[in-house]
From Swiss-Prot:
Name of the protein: 1-deoxy-D-xylulose 5-phosphate reductoisomerase
PANTHER family associated with the record: 1-DEOXY-D-XYLULOSE 5-PHOSPHATE REDUCTOISOMERASE (PTHR30525), 1-DEOXY-D-XYLULOSE 5-PHOSPHATE REDUCTOISOMERASE, CHLOROPLASTIC (PTHR30525:SF0)
Enzymatic class: oxidoreductase
Binding of Mn(2+), residues: 150, 152, 221
Role summary: Catalyzes the NADPH-dependent rearrangement and reduction of 1-deoxy-D-xylulose-5-phosphate (DXP) to 2-C-methyl-D-erythritol 4-phosphate (MEP).
Entry similarity comment: Belongs to the DXR family.
Record EC number: 1.1.1.267
Recorded GO MF terms: 1-deoxy-D-xylulose-5-phosphate reductoisomerase activity; manganese ion binding; NADPH binding
InterPro entries, sorted: DXP_reductoisomerase, DXP_reductoisomerase_C, DXP_reductoisomerase_N, DXPR_C, DXPR_C_sf, NAD(P)-bd_dom_sf
Keyword list, A-Z: Isoprene biosynthesis, Manganese, Metal-binding, NADP, Oxidoreductase
Catalytic activity line of the entry: 2-C-methyl-D-erythritol 4-phosphate + NADP(+) = 1-deoxy-D-xylulose 5-phosphate + NADPH + H(+)
């Protein structure tokens, strides 16, 4: 019985992880839950899974939870705020922490879990993108396992099992192409929020679905793959694979190519991250190659997806620039979802922030450097959006 904690328990990753726990109660026990603001759903999860410790960032939701669980025959530890989430992450009884918090908000809780000796099922890619220079040395120092729980990096990790050190030559990340893969570039100026959050294959949260539509999600995954698997950026490629059946591939030194296939279901990589190195039997629908039909691939359109190249450039620059890229993207997507900027303004604002930060880059950033870069980039994007609202071109900002 593995004891686990779930950060972001009311989001897409968290609820799918709890689906796994519900299906395999003899394999997993929930010790801790944390979320940002969905007190009603969190209360339901407390009733069902009976965790020892719980945190919600939004303190105003605490009474909702207390009222909902007042009749229970036990009392979990209830915490609030970001500090509460950190306490849940490091809570003593848990063996593995699923990091399902969206964005850079997951960085500090993940660091706390690593320092407490917890293995990490990493579904929060921003932790490595922004904090890789800090997180990876901590993983080595504390001897914990960092296991990818997103589909692409789980696929790479699975393909690498049994590959000797030095055997990896190239990584090929597959991308669905997102909501607008079949739209002409000229139509992107008319994109609405409702258009952008309709993913053709995957069921995900709003922010990551927009990232998929811009292909920033794949660009961020390139940076994550660099940190996880140690390849340089010119050895990490992206291909559009509309069917989302092949989740990623690796090329070995002899040019052999290995791939991991499966239906687009996030439970598969989550289960593997929690059960590795074991394989747990499931009754989920097996892949039927005849039903799946043809597999197609094409090169991404760099003009249509400028965010992808911004991510490659930030990764190659290194230092705190990936943290700037990530924060600028988070803020720009948030503004788009609030209908304060247009879809095509997302990459413009990200590029603006990255360009402005060039002379402030630090080659070996500390945690404080990363957090400051994150704060700075968000402010720059907000200022840039305000200039856009006034009718000014952001290129003219000083």
């Amino acid at each position: 019985m593995k004891k686990i904690t779930i950060l972001g328990s009311t989001g897409s990753i968290g609820t799918q992880t709890l689906d796994i726990v519900q299906q395999y109660p003899d394999q997993f026990q929930v010790v801790g839950l944390a979320t940002r603001n969905n007190g009603e759903l969190l209360a339901q999860q407390i009733k069902q899974f009976r965790p020892e410790i719980v945190a919600i960032c939004q303190e105003s939701q605490l009474n909702t939870i207390k009222d909902a669980i007042a009749s229970l025959d036990y009392s979990p530890i209830l915490l609030t705020g970001e500090a509460g989430v950190v306490e849940v992450a490091r809570y003593g009884d848990s063996e593995s922490v699923v990091t399902g918090i969206v964005g850079c908000a997951g960085l500090l809780p993940t660091i706390a879990a690593i320092e407490a000796g917890k293995d990490i099922a990493l579904a929060n890619k921003e932790t490595l993108i922004a904090g890789g220079p800090v997180v990876l040395p901590l993983v080595e120092k504390h001897g914990v396992k960092l296991l990818p729980a997103d589909s692409e990096h789980s696929a790479i990790f699975q393909c690498l099992q049994g590959v000797p050190k030095g055997g990896l030559r190239r990584i090929i990340l597959t991308a669905s192409g997102g909501a607008f893969r079949d739209w002409p570039v000229e139509q992107l100026k008319f994109v609405t929020v409702e258009d952008a959050i309709k993913h053709p294959n995957w069921s995900m949260g709003r922010k990551i679905t927009v990232d998929s539509a811009t292909l920033m999600n794949k660009g961020l995954e390139v940076i994550e793959a660099h940190y996880l698997f140690g390849l340089e950026y010119d050895k990490i490629d992206i291909v559009i694979h509309p069917q989302s059946i092949i989740h990623s591939l690796i090329e070995l030194q002899d040019t052999s190519v290995l791939a991991q296939l499966g239906w687009p279901d996030m439970r598969l990589p989550l289960l593997y991250a929690l059960s590795w190195p074991e394989r747990i039997y499931t009754d989920w629908e097996p892949l039927d190659l005849v039903k799946a039909g043809s597999f197609t691939f094409r090169e991404p359109d760099h003009h249509k997806y400028p965010c992808m190249q911004l991510a490659y450039a930030a990764g190659r620059s290194g230092g705190a620039i990936p943290a700037v890229l990530n924060a600028a993207n988070e803020q720009a997507v948030a503004l788009f979802l609030e209908e304060k900027i247009a879809f095509l303004e997302i990459p413009k604002l990200i590029e603006m922030a990255c360009d402005r930060f060039t002379n402030q880059n630090t080659s070996t950033p500390t945690l404080e450097d990363i957090l400051e870069a994150d704060r700075w980039a968000r402010q720059e994007v907000i200022k840039g959006s305000q200039e856009i609202a006034k009718g000014n071109k952001i290129m003219s900002l000083t």
